[in-house]
């Protein structure tokens, strides 16, 4: 019986606290991303998005170059 009360108390606390803890910022983000200001969508999030984009592109280009190097190295085996 006591376990049932404890489980109900835990469920009640999990159900009510998460809803009140965070403020809904979806309308703000929608306005930001729907503006027509000639900025690409992947850069509208600010400086963090810009850094993340550049790091991702750098890693993609580096990985592509390394894979081409490995293919070239494997295509000319040593005797």
Swiss-Prot record:
InterPro entries reported for this sequence: COX7a, Cyt_c_oxidase_su7a_sf, Cytc_oxidase_su7a_met
Transit peptide: 1-21
CDD domains found in the cross-reference section: Cyt_c_Oxidase_VIIa
Entry's localization field: Mitochondrion inner membrane
Membrane topology: Single-pass membrane protein
Keywords on record: Membrane, Mitochondrion, Mitochondrion inner membrane, Oxidoreductase, Transit peptide, Transmembrane, Transmembrane helix
One of the GO biological process terms: regulation of oxidative phosphorylation
GO molecular function: oxidoreductase activity
Record topology, Mitochondrial matrix segments: 22-46
Record field: transmembrane: 47-75
Metabolic or biological pathway, per its Swiss-Prot or TrEMBL entry: Energy metabolism; oxidative phosphorylation
Signal sequence interval, chain numbering: none
GO cellular component: mitochondrial inner membrane; respiratory chain complex IV
Residue runs in coiled coils: none
Pfam families in UniProt: COX7a
Mitochondrial intermembrane side: 76-79
Family of the protein in this entry: Belongs to the cytochrome c oxidase VIIa family.
Assembly: Component of the complex IV (CIV, cytochrome c oxidase), a multisubunit enzyme composed of 14 subunits. The complex is composed of a catalytic core of 3 subunits MT-CO1, MT-CO2 and MT-CO3, encoded in the mitochondrial DNA, and 11 supernumerary subunits COX4I1 (or COX4I2), COX5A, COX5B, COX6A2 (or COX6A1), COX6B1 (or COX6B2), COX6C, COX7A1 (or COX7A2), COX7B, COX7C, COX8B and NDUFA4, which are encoded in the nuclear genome.
Function noted in UniProt: Component of the mitochondrial respiratory complex IV (CIV, also named cytochrome c oxidase complex), the last enzyme in the mitochondrial electron transport chain which drives oxidative phosphorylation. The CIV complex is the component of the respiratory chain that catalyzes the reduction of oxygen to water. Acts as an assembly factor that specifically drives the homodimerization of CIV complexes, mediating the formation of mitochondrial respiratory supercomplexes (respirasomes) containing two CIV: supercomplxes with two molecules of CIV show improved activity.
Name assigned to this protein: Cytochrome c oxidase subunit 7A1, mitochondrial
Phylogenetic lineage: Eukaryota, Metazoa, Chordata, Craniata, Vertebrata
């Amino acid at each position: 019986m006591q376990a049932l009360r404890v489980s109900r108390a835990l469920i009640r606390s999990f159900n009510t606290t998460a809803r009140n803890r965070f403020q809904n910022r979806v309308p703000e983000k929608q306005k930001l991303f729907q503006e027509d200001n000639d900025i690409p969508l992947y850069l509208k999030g600010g400086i963090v998005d810009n850094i993340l984009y550049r790091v991702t592109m750098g890693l993609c280009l580096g990985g592509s170059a390394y894979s081409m190097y490995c293919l070239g190295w494997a295509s000319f085996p040593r005797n």
